[in-house]
Structures are given as structure tokens and as C-alpha cells.
């Protein structure tokens, strides 16, 4: 799988917070995917842990979130999806939360309002951001394997069309850092789920592959490739889908990974449209 143009940057008031951005997404849209660098948390959450659910010091997490928002160039409130590992999409409107961070029970958030910042927490699952240059709508989605086979990203495409009149061919989608096929080993029950979700897709070859180590009853799955297939099936142009190639599980120096460490921090992907 190729990448269309992810680039690491040093940005924001802290000056030392690396972000990953896609060249597909241009102003007035802003977005970014965090790494584990640039924060204040102590091990095993070192250093830019953005999730408060797994045991880190709350004040450290709050400082890390402020640093991320400054680096991306946005302000609160920050609306984040409290993932349910499905395909639930929720629309967010300006004023739904007065300040701070607002958690919504969903796997994806969409908005048509400028100045509304959407985000998702991950630690191996795919953080996806979607922008529509024609309507100005944006979305942030969490796509783990369950959300992938449930069709969370096609559900986002449909929701953007229903709520804002978005056309799939106008959308630009960026898939941030996530577990790669090198490390995502699964059993036959998960393989069957992917085979069902991708049935009839002519370009699904290479999504599921035998264990490279020859482990009986085990396969490896390429989550990003699976979501490319599903997005293309939903009408998104293949050259409007960007995907970071790095694996969160393999690259311990740069990324948190639940599969690798269990006790770990969380990364974020965030997106917004700046007011005119």
C-alpha cells in the first residue's frame, strides 16, 4: 500500500510536538495525528498520552491535550468519540459543549460547523479524518477491526451525504497511524468477518493473508487496505484516500500500542474547519 504524502512536522507553541499530516488536506481544514512524543506523562504513558482512562495522571493528560490543540492550531471544546467498536455516526453542532472535552457515544463524529474540533482516541485502531472541500463538512472516525467490518467509514460517507449533501467523489480521507499487517495476527473467526464484509470486492486481494511465520490457524489482516476497499466501494476516489504506512505495534519509539504493551497511552487524530 502506498502513501500519498504524510509528513512529520514540528508545530505549535510547545515547539517540540511532532505531528503527522496529510498533503491531501489543505486550508481551511486543519488536522493532525499525534505520536507519543512531546508531552509530559511518565512511563508507561510517556510522553504525549492523550487518554485519561488507563491510569495516567489526569493533569498530565490535560496538559498533553492542550499541547496537541495548540500544535494543530485549534481551540476547545474538543468533541471526541467514545468508541463502541461499531458503525455509529453522530452529528456535532457548535454549542453542544461549552468548553473542555465532550465525549459522544459513537465511533464517528461529523459536523458542518466551522470551529468545531472532532477527535478520536486510538492505540492500534485506525484514526480516520474526512473532509469535504465542497460543503466544508468534516468527520473523525475510529476504525478498529470490528468497526471496519461493520462499515464505519462507509457509514460516515452516507451520513455526510444525508446531513450535508456531500458527494462521495468530493471527499478526501486520511487514515492515520495504526497497527499494520505485519503485527495484526488474527484467528479464523475474525477472518470470516472480513471475508463477509469484503465479499464481492474485486480489489480485496491482499487484505487477509496467511501467517508469514506459518502459524497454523492464524492469518494477518491489513486494516488500512480493507478500509481502502470499503471506501472505494462507497464511492470515494482511490487517489483521494491517504494512508500512513507505519505500524503502531511495530514502532514502539513513536507510537502507543495496546496489542504490544497492554498498559499504554493513547494517540489521537483530530480535524476541524477554521472559520472564514
Model-found features: residue ranges?
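Active-site microenvironment for binding and transforming phosphate-containing groups
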Residues: 1-276
Amino acid at each position: 500500500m502506498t502513501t500519498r504524502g504524510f509528513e512529520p512536522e514540528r508545530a505549535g507553541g510547545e515547539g517540540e510536538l511532532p505531528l503527522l499530516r496529510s498533503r491531501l488536506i489543505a486550508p481551511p481544514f486543519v488536522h493532525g495525528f499525534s505520536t507519543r512524543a512531546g508531552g509530559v506523562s511518565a512511563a508507561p504513558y510517556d510522553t504525549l498520552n492523550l487518554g485519561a482512562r488507563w491510569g495516567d495522571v489526569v493533569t498530565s493528560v490535560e496538559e498533553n491535550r492542550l499541547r496537541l490543540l495548540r500544535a494543530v492550531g485549534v481551540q476547545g471544546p474538543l468533541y471526541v468519540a467514545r468508541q463502541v467498536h461499531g458503525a455509529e455516526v453522530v452529528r456535532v453542532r457548535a454549542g453542544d459543549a461549552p468548553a473542555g472535552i465532550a465525549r459522544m457515544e459513537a465511533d464517528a463524529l461529523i459536523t458542518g460547523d466551522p470551529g468545531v474540533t472532532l477527535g478520536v482516541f486510538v492505540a492500534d485502531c485506525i484514526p480516520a479524518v474526512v473532509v469535504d472541500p465542497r460543503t466544508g463538512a468534516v468527520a473523525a472516525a475510529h476504525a478498529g477491526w470490528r468497526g471496519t467490518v461493520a462499515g464505519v467509514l462507509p457509514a460516515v460517507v452516507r451520513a455526510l451525504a444525508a446531513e450535508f449533501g456531500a458527494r462521495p467523489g468530493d471527499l478526501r480521507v486520511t487514515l492515520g497511524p495504526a497497527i499494520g499487517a505485519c503485527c495484526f495476527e488474527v484467528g479464523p473467526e475474525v477472518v470470516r468477518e472480513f471475508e463477509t464484509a469484503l465479499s464481492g470486492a474485486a480489489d480485496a486481494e491482499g487484505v487477509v493473508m496467511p501467517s508469514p511465520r506459518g502459524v497454523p490457524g492464524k492469518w494477518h489482516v491489513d486494516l488500512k487496505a480493507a478500509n481502502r476497499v470499503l471506501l472505494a466501494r462507497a464511492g470515494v476516489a482511490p487517489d483521494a484516500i491517504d494512508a500512513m504506512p507505519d505500524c503502531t505495534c511495530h514502532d514502539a519509539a513513536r507510537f502507543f500500542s495496546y496489542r504490544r504493551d497492554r498498559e499504554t497511552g493513547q494517540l489521537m487524530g483530530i480535524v476541524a474547519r477554521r472559520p472564514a
